[in-house]
């Protein structure tokens, strides 16, 4: 299949699989329609996604290359399909717990979505391929959330109808995943040889090799890449921040709807537009950050500390406020700050890391973030059994601890610079 057709298909798949209008009103559906309490959802249902995602991530990361990408895409689409089959037909707590297992599987295998296109396009097209595939995800989410807002805000339909619309979209996503062209091991092997700057006639090398040679190259390269990544203290520092920041970000986004749900149902009618605004505001914030001519190796610690303090303040405000507009705006600003700091982290790593290692680093950092989130969930929800508002106080304090750590790092650097300047 021609390259542009593959690009169109994978972007269509990305947009359709993200077209899930249920999501902004997921808690409202489970709480009001299925009659599940906040405590039940908080302690028995939602934590399962974290554990499922954590357990599935490493196998998904390894098997993406072993199974040559497409099977993992189909698995992702089918997992989302099963989620919404359960949303439509499942009414019990047990069914919602099974749903969270499939949801964890789906989110863990999303790594195949980005890996697939890099095999199908030339190295010179990686940047545009990344832009298009990421844009497709944002477009799908925005359209889904905007539609949900329109239908619910105008009282045109019920939460159950949103589930049916999402199920139809997931059915189409399965179809699109199935018709995507597969990847031959020789095609993937040649691409890895090219990415590793192997000299000579690549097609001839591939023709003289076997599938086991391809696997051997993958696993040997994995070991060498792990060693290459964490020898660099700068990469290690930014990876620590990425894991710490992503951990609490996942937790906040997973439980924000529960916090909104503490207010009367009539106040929760703008969940859709709130979620839709996040990617729209995140895009210009991302572009502005990329244009700033700042040495983030020097000033990044200070920015991360200030950003974490801002996020701590927003979460604490959310924990105390009973006004839905305040909760919505605080959530939007929290997400935008996360987008800004994440963009800075990624751009800083880009100067210190071979682009071939981004996927590996992202996978490891995500795994560590999920491991930390699992511990946080176990302590805050399973052990302490905190209600949702005290939970957000804890999350606010978490950000303050992160801010304190990076403020110390910046202080050490600034002190050394000051004494060095004074000495000279």
UniProtKB/Swiss-Prot annotation:
Its main location: membrane. Belongs to the reduced folate carrier (RFC) transporter (TC 2.A.48) family. One of its GO terms (biological process) is transmembrane transport. SUPFAM superfamilies: MFS general substrate transporter. This is Folate-like transporter 2. The keyword Transport applies. One of its GO terms (cellular component) is plasma membrane. It is a multi-pass membrane protein. Unlike folt-1, does not appear to act as a folate transporter. InterPro entries: Folate_carrier (IPR002666), MFS_trans_sf (IPR036259), ThTr-1 (IPR028338). The chain crosses the membrane at residues 48-68, 71-91, 99-119, 136-156, 164-184, 233-253, 299-319, 324-344, 361-381, 392-412. Glycans are attached at residues 35, 254. GO terms for molecular function: folic acid binding; vitamin transmembrane transporter activity. It is found in: Membrane. PANTHER family: FOLATE TRANSPORTER, FOLATE-LIKE TRANSPORTER 2. Keywords: Folate-binding, Glycoprotein, Membrane, Transmembrane, Transmembrane helix, Transport.
């Amino acid at each position: 299949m021609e390259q542009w057709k593959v690009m169109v298909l994978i972007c269509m798949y990305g947009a359709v699989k993200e077209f899930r209008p249920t999501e902004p009103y997921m808690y409202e559906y489970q709480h009001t329609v299925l009659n599940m309490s906040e405590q039940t959802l908080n302690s028995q249902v939602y934590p399962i996604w974290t554990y499922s995602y954590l357990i599935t991530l490493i196998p998904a990361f390894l098997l993406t290359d072993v199974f040559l990408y497409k099977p993992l895409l189909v698995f992702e689409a089918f997992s989302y399909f099963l989620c919404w089959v359960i949303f439509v037909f499942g009414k019990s707590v047990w069914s919602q717990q099974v749903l969270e297992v499939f949801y964890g599987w789906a989110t863990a295998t999303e790594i195949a979505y980005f890996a697939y296109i890099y095999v199908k396009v030339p190295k010179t097209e990686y940047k545009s391929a990344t832009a298009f595939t990421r844009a497709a995800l944002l477009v799908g989410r925005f359209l889904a959330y905007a539609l949900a807002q329109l239908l619910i805000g105008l009282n045109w339909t019920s939460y159950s109808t949103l589930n049916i619309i999402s199920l139809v979209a997931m059915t189409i996503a399965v179809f699109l995943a199935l018709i995507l062209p597969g990847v031959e091991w020789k095609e993937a092997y040649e691409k890895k040889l090219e990415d590793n700057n192997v000299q000579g006639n690549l097609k001839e090398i591939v023709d003289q090799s076997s599938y086991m040679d391809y696997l051997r190259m993958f696993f040997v390269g994995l070991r060498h890449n792990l060693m290459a990544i964490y020898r660099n203290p700068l990469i290690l520092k930014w990876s620590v921040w990425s894991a710490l920041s992503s951990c609490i970000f996942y937790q906040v986004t997973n439980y924000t709807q529960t916090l909104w749900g503490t207010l009367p149902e009539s106040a929760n009618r703008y969940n859709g537009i709130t979620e839709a605004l996040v990617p729209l505001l995140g895009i210009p914030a991302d572009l502005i950050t990329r244009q700033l001519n700042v040495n983030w190796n020097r000033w990044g610690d200070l920015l991360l500390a200030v950003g974490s303090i801002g996020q701590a303040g927003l979460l604490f405000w959310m924990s105390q406020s009973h006004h839905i507009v305040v909760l919505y705006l605080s959530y939007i600003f929290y997400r935008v700050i996360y987008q800004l700091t994440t963009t800075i982290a990624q751009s800083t790593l880009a100067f210190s890391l071979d682009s071939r290692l981004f996927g590996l680093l992202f996978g490891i950092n995500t795994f560590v973030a999920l491991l930390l989130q699992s511990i946080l969930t176990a302590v805050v929800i399973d052990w302490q059994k905190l209600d949702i508002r005290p939970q957000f106080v804890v999350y606010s304090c978490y950000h303050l601890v992160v801010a304190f750590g990076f403020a110390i790092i910046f202080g050490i650097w600034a002190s050394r610079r000051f004494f060095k300047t004074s000495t000279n």
